[in-house]
Amino acid sequence: DLAVLRIGENVLFRGLGDCKFERANEAWKFDGGDGWTVAFSATWEQGRDWPTLAIGNFMDRETIIMDYGDCDASWLFRHNPGTGYQNPMALQPGHCTNSMLFSDWNRDGFADLRVSNDQEFYRRGSEQLFSLGPRGAVPMQAEDGWRTVNIWGMGIASNDITGDGYPDYYLTNMAANRFEVLAEGATGPSYEDRAGDFNI
C-alpha cells in the first residue's frame, strides 16, 4: 500500500500487485484533507488490525502572506471496525511540522510520536513528543521530563547507537544537527545533545 502526501488532498492507495495500485480513501474512510502535508509516519499499535497513521502539516495555507503564515495542526488516524479512518484526532498545538517518527522511546511496548518543527515559522513552539493513549495524543511537558529544544527541524532518524538498549535520535537542522541520547538516570523523555561527544 502507498501513502501520497500533497499540497491538497493526501491519498492512500491499496496495492494490487504487479506494481498496480487503486485509490482507497473512500473505501478506508480516510479524509485526505486540504493542507500542506510534509510529514508521515505509521505504526502498529497493540490490539489494532490496521496501522495508526500520523499526518504532519506545515503552514495553514489560508494564512500565508509573503511566505509566512500560521502553523497548521497535524492529525492522528486510528482505524476502527466499521468506521475506518474516520474522525482523526488533531495533534495540537501545531508548530510547522517537517518530520515525524513513531518510536518506543522507553521500550515499554508502546510507540509515542516525535515531531520535528521549523522554528523559522512558529511562535512559542519547540520540538514535540506526543504520548499516545486512548484519549488521543497528548504533548509531553517539562513536568514529564521533556526538554524544550528549538531548531530548524528537518528530519528524524533513530537507532540504538550507544548500545544501551534505548533508541537514540539524530535530528537534522539548518544549523548544527543534534544527536539526542536519553539522559543518564532519566525517568522521563529527557534527552541530551551528544553530537560533540560522538564527533557527528
Regions found by a protein language model. Give the residues of each.
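Acidic, glycine/proline-rich Ca2+-coordinating loop motifs
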Residues: 1-200
